[in-house]
Amino acid sequence: MSRFLNVLRSWLVMVSVIAAGNTLQSFRDHSFLSEKLYTASPGLVNGLQARTFGVWTLLSSVIRCLCAIDIRNRTPDNARDFQCIIEHSFLYYITLFTFFLALVHFLSEVFIYHTAALTIGVMAPLMVASFSILGMLIGLQYLEVEALSQNKKKN
């Protein structure tokens, strides 16, 4: 496995652990969201919204951790061509999608719904999502090269 993929796996685990902590915080005290994220409209944050946010964050955390454990899930042993690789890449792409979804969510809360301001509490998840998207897109190239080289060895 390439060094880049090992770093990406470590990054995904770290982000997953942080997300698990945010999940606990969302369930423990919903004022966490109004004080750190949705600062432009803190009155809209209630317990139900915080728990929903917590469940979403927990789901993202689990998906990201599973991808870190099995980052090659997108390259099956029987991959014969690029189409086969794409068809078997669900967990990697779902993980990538969790970061796109987080990025779109926070950007829309800031620029469309105006419930969040560009504070450090919002900038942090925006930067994590952006760096993660970039890293996972680069990781796709490494995984593709590995899959193609493994395929050549088998033939």
Annotate the PLM regions.
Residues 17-49, 54:
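Hydrophobic transmembrane helix segments
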Residues 1-19:
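Cytosolic juxtamembrane helix and N-cap/initiation of the first transmembrane helix
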Residues 78-80, 92-109:
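Hydrophobic alpha-helical membrane segments
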Residues 69-75, 85-88, 103-123:
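Membrane-helix boundary connector in multi-pass membrane proteins
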Residues 17, 45-69, 81, 97-100:
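Core segments of alpha-helical transmembrane spans in multipass integral membrane proteins
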Residues 24-36, 62, 71-75, 84-90, ...:
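Juxtamembrane interfacial secondary-structure elements that flank transmembrane helices
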Residues 130-151, 155:
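Membrane-water interface at the C-terminal end of transmembrane alpha helices
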Residues 2-6, 40-48, 72, 82-89, ...:
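Juxtamembrane loop-transmembrane helix junctions in multi-pass integral membrane proteins
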